[in-house]
C-alpha cells in the first residue's frame, strides 16, 4: 500500500495476483466507459438525453457493460482471496470511507440543493464517494502503516 494509502504497489505482487488485479482493473475501466455512454444516452448526467445511438446497439452496449463488470468482479475476487488480512482490511476501510463520503457529502448536497438551485447528478455523487474513499484509505494508512 503506497502513496499514503491511495494505491497498491502492483510490482510487489506475484505474477498470478498481478494478472488478476490488472484484468479486474481493465474490465472495470472498460465497463465504466460503457456506463458513461449509457448514462449520457439516458440523460442521467444532468443534461438532456442524447438518443443518438440506435436501440439495438444500446442494448448490446448495456449487455457488454454488465458482462465486463461481472468479469472484473470475478478477477477481483480471485485477487482478493489470496491477499493477507492487512490488505483486506485496507480495502474494507476504503469502501467504508466511500460509503461514509457518499452519505455525508452526497446527502448534504441533496439536502442543500433546493436552497442553491443546484441539483446534483451522477458526477457529484461519485465525487462524494471518491472523496470518502480517499479519506478512508488515508486514515487506514495513518493508523496501520505510517511510521511515526
What are these regions (language model features)?
Residues 1-82, 86-148:
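Alpha-helical propensity feature that highlights long, continuous alpha-helices across diverse contexts
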